[in-house]
Design a protein with these regions (language model features):
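Serine-hydrolase catalytic machinery in alpha/beta-hydrolase-like enzymes
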Residues: 1-93, 97
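Short, conserved loop/helix-junction motifs that constitute active-site signature segments
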Residues: 32-35, 140-146
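Alpha/beta-hydrolase-fold catalytic nucleophile elbow
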Residues: 44, 101, 125-128, 152, ...
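Primarily recognizes the serine-hydrolase "nucleophile elbow" in alpha/beta-hydrolase
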Residues: 96-144
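Short, proline-enriched alpha-helix->beta-strand connector loops that line the catalytic pocket
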Residues: 144-149, 175-177
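Short beta-strand/loop motif that positions the catalytic acidic residue
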Residues: 151-153, 157
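C-terminal catalytic histidine-bearing segment of alpha/beta-hydrolase fold enzymes
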Residues: 163-211
Length: 211
C-alpha cells in the first residue's frame, strides 16, 4: 500500500490488478509514477497459477482463442468487488473516487467490474486485456452513469492480440462505457509511453493538478 504524498482525510483510491502468473508486487512497481494524491493498493488474484504466481481465472490454452474458466472469473469478480469495498473502509478512502487499473487478466477483471457496478468507479484503466463475454451485461444500460474506461493495447502483442482490443473498441461504448482507446507499437507489456498516458489519465479523473 502506498499512502498519498500529503495527508488527506479521505484520499482517492487506486486498486491495481496484475496479470496471470504474477502477484500483487508486480504492478505495485508502477506506484511511484502515479499521482501522489492517490492511495494505491495492489490486489492478489485468488487462484494459484502454474507454474508460478496467481490468476484471476484459469485459461485453456489448447482452445483457439484460449478459453477462460468462466466460473473462476465470476468468483474473482465477486471477490474483487468485495475487496474494493473492504479497502475503502479499511483505509478510509473516498468511495466516490475509486479507480481500477489492470494489466492482461487484471485488465479483463477491471473492465468486468466497471460493467457490473459502474456507479462504484470514477474510472477504469485496462492495459493489454480482453473482454470476458460471459461477464458482459445482457443488454445495454438504460440511463445511469457512463463509466470512463481507458483501454490501452500493443499492436505487436503476441499474447492478447490487437484483435481483442479492436473488439473492445467496438463493443464497449454501446454498453455504457465512455471509452478512451489508445494503441502503441509495443508487445504484451506496459511501455514508457503507455505508462505516462495511464498516469495522466488517472490524474485527469481526479481533476486539478497533481500534487
Amino acid at each position: 500500500m502506498r499512502r498519498p504524498g500529503a495527508a488527506s482525510a479521505r484520499p482517492p483510491l487506486a486498486v491495481l490488478l496484475h496479470g496471470i502468473g504474477a502477484d500483487e508486487t508486480d504492478l505495485f512497481a508502477l506506484a511511484p509514477a502515479l499521482d501522489p494524491r492517490l492511495l494505491v493498493v495492489s490486489a492478489r488474484a485468488p487462484f494459484e497459477a502454474e507454474p508460478m504466481g496467481y490468476a484471476w481465472y484459469a485459461i485453456d490454452w489448447y482452445e483457439h482463442p484460449p478459453r477462460p474458466d468462466v466460473a473462476q472469473a465470476r468468483a474473482s469478480l465477486e471477490r474483487l468487488l468485495a475487496f474494493v469495498g473492504e479497502a475503502v473502509e479499511a483505509y478510509d478512502a473516498d468511495p466516490s473516487q475509486v479507480l481500477l487499473a489492470g494489466f492482461s487478466q487484471g485488465a479483463s477483471m477491471a473492465v468486468s467490474a466497471a460493467l457490473a457496478r459502474p456507479e462504484a468507479f470514477l474510472g477504469v484503466a485496462a492495459h493489454s486485456g480482453r473482454l470476458l463475454h460471459a461477464l458482459l451485461p445482457a443488454s445495454p444500460p438504460h440511463g445511469g452513469p457512463r463509466v470512463p474506461v481507458l483501454w490501452q493495447h500493443g499492436r505487436l502483442d503476441p499474447v492478447v492480440p490487437m484483435a481483442f482490443g479492436d473488439e473492445a473498441r467496438r463493443l464497449l461504448p454501446p454498453l455504457g462505457v465512455d471509452l478512451d482507446f489508445r494503441e502503441y507499437a509495443i508487445g504484451h507489456e506496459i511501455g514508457a509511453e503507455s505508462l505516462r498516458d495511464l498516469a495522466t489519465w488517472l490524474s485527469g479523473r481526479l481533476g486539478g493538478a497533481g500534487a
